[in-house]
A protein has these predicted regions:
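Active-site nucleotide/adenylate-binding loops and adjacent lid/helix of ATP-dependent enzymes
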Residues: 1-2, 14, 30, 44-45, ...
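ATP-binding N-terminal substructure of ATP-dependent carboxylate-amine bond-forming enzymes
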Residues: 1-92, 99, 111-123
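Residue-level detector of flexible, active-site-proximal loop/helix-junction positions
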Residues: 37-39, 58, 83, 111-114, ...
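Short small-residue beta-strand/loop micro-motif enriched in glycine and branched aliphatics
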Residues: 78, 143, 213-217
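Phosphate-binding site of ATP-dependent enzymes
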Residues: 150-218
């Protein structure tokens, strides 16, 4: 399953095509399914042995697709419905981290409905948030919509832009440091990679565009 309707569609298609090449080399028979072209309900008719989920972002990683996979009663790869919902929803993730005493940056949630700019400075002070700050959509992947704000004017500008497409935003203290990724399969770490982007941070372009020239250190 690849493509879909999210802002990460292009990356999902690339992911899916790479997986198809690899799986065909291993002798598997592959049928592709793109939710942008067919209804998820059509999956049940496929009679597939397993669904390989190569979707990215909204409807692909937030529990939506997973609920249809469960409905189809066909085994599928990657996380289930609840874990996908919590992982894609940054606020839910942060609450789980806090409940389990896992460190996470201080934050403040703002909603498009009823938001008042004049109250923001006081709220940031109350939440002990200091510049530079990070603002991002609550439900988005691949660093889409993530902005680092150095001052209040910059923050207000980005809030206005992001509210055009998103209802809920999260403002956090910026935490600098190393960017390290660790893949885990069946509770086993497969190795770590340090990422050194040439850009300000590991944003969408740094992740996916060769021109960004991000260094990957094994």
């Amino acid at each position: 399953v690849l493509g879909g309707n999210s802002k990460e569609r292009e990356i999902s298609v690339k992911t899916g095509k790479a997986c198809i090449v690899a799986m065909k080399k291993l002798g598997y028979i592959i049928n592709t399914f793109d939710p942008k072209k067919k209804s998820f309900f059509e999956i049940k008719k496929s009679k597939a042995d397993i669904i390989f989920n190569a979707l990215h972002g909204e409807e692909g990683e937030d529990g939506y697709a997973q609920s249809f996979f469960e409905y189809s009663k066909i085994p599928y790869t990657h996380s289930g419905v609840l874990s996908s919902m919590n992982a894609m929803n940054k606020l839910s993730s942060k609450k789980i981290f806090i409940e389990n005493k896992i460190k996470t940056p201080l934050y403040y949630v703002i909603e498009k409905k009823g938001f008042v700019h004049s109250n923001l400075k006081k709220k940031l002070d109350t939440k002990k948030l200091k510049f530079p700050l990070v603002i991002k959509p609550n439900n988005e992947g691949s660093s889409i919509g993530v902005k680092i704000c150095k001052n209040f004017i910059n923050l207000k500008k980005n809030i206005k832009v992001l509210f055009k497409n998103y209802e809920t935003l999260i403002i956090e203290n910026f935490i600098g440091g190393q960017e390290i990724q660790v893949a885990v399969l069946d509770n086993k770490a497969l190795g770590a990679i340090e990422l050194k982007p040439k850009r300000k941070f590991y944003d969408y372009k740094a992740k996916y565009q060769k021109s960004a020239k991000t260094d990957h250190i094994m």
